[in-house]
Amino acid sequence: MQKFTVHKGLVAPMDRENVDTDAIIPKQFLKSIRKTGFGPNLFDAWRYLDAGFPGQDPASRKPNPDFVLNQPRYAGASILLARKNFGCGSSREHAPWALDQYGFRAIIAPSYADIFFNNSFKNGLLPIVLPEAQIAQLFDEVNAFPGYTLTIDLERQVIVKPQGKELPFEVQAFRKYCLLNGFDDIGLTLRQSDKIKAFEAERLAKKPWLNHTIPG
């Protein structure tokens, strides 16, 4: 998992409440047995004028010119500004996968659905919670100033606005540790590989029959 320490990026505003996971990555794209390739279908039903299907060449699609991520001023955005209850709906880990693979490193919103919130941390995507008043002000500034960027300093737990003003945010210590070091669940487990190997060796020494395979 990619480390998250300090990130400066262009902000794209998703000015809708209750954006659910089916809007983030529609159900027809969940058939893939791979963990990659979801970025082109992020917000698929809003992003394109034609219906999408798995394996389709994105270059053959008809982009919706009115959708925020298709507007030239937000090309290359890596921070998504959203409204309350972002990521509600069904429990699909594909939602943070799609956001990450599109290029987003962080989301800033007043609130999130719990499962989406947890899945985001586990996949290297930082979901930041700010008060609605601060979110509203950020929307005003992003809309008013093309090329609006923010700097997110996870170590210090602050968002730095273009003029230098800092907005503090909270993050649970263990989640912060994992993001700073790029540890997902597998990475955390592998850090204990010596202890795991020692346990297996001790177990086989005490119960050697466990090392025998059953003839086919």
UniProtKB/Swiss-Prot annotation:
Reaction catalyzed: (2R,3S)-3-isopropylmalate = (2S)-2-isopropylmalate
GO biological process, any: L-leucine biosynthetic process
EC number: 4.2.1.33
Gene3D superfamilies to which the protein is assigned, alphabetical: Aconitase, domain 4
Pathway: Amino-acid biosynthesis; L-leucine biosynthesis; L-leucine from 3-methyl-2-oxobutanoate: step 2/4
Any one GO cellular component localisation term in the record: 3-isopropylmalate dehydratase complex
Record's protein name: 3-isopropylmalate dehydratase small subunit
